[in-house]
Amino acid sequence: MQKLKCKICGYVHEGAMEADFKCPICKAGADKFEKIEVKNPYAGTKTEKNLWAAFAGESQARNKYTYFASVAKKAGYEQIAAIFLQTAENEKEHAKLWFKALGELGDTAENLLHAAEGENYEWTDMYDQFAKDAEAEGFYELAAQFRGVAAIEKTHEERYRALLTNVETKAVFEKSGIVMWECRNCGHLVLSASAPEKCPVCNHPQSYFEIRKENY
């Protein structure tokens, strides 16, 4: 299936595109879309399906082992908990192998867009249908949980899109006004419109700075 990317806002459309198509995000016309080069050499093959199955299996195993580690730790089995966590990290790397083979690991802007679209699907479609199905079968408490999680996924999408805008406009480390920057490594504070290229205290690079936030 072909993928077309809006040159204005970055929205990705999958499948055929009619001449009168309008971008659902910025309303740009079909002439503002460009075809995305396919990075998956396994597209359309049984191997591609196997790679997705392997990725899903390893990802689920990683989460399960993390949960199992918590149970073991609470029961007093420190070594077993540590082994569960170590294996979970192994599974994470296995999943990464298959995800990269599928060509799904892009640059930060692409990853933010991909993440935002995934969250959008979850709160607008997936959990909405799950909640309806649960209600139809009498599982009202679970339906409420599905809707509660959907509301959270909506905020996740909004956050990813805001971060994507920062990346695209080069505003991650440069703001329009004076703000308080904090080094994530040593805690050094800088009052400025832009984060320093290097922390003057611990010498960590600009990438370690973020706008200081207080929630206490």
Locations of regions flagged by a protein language model:
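Non-heme di-metal
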Residues: 2-216
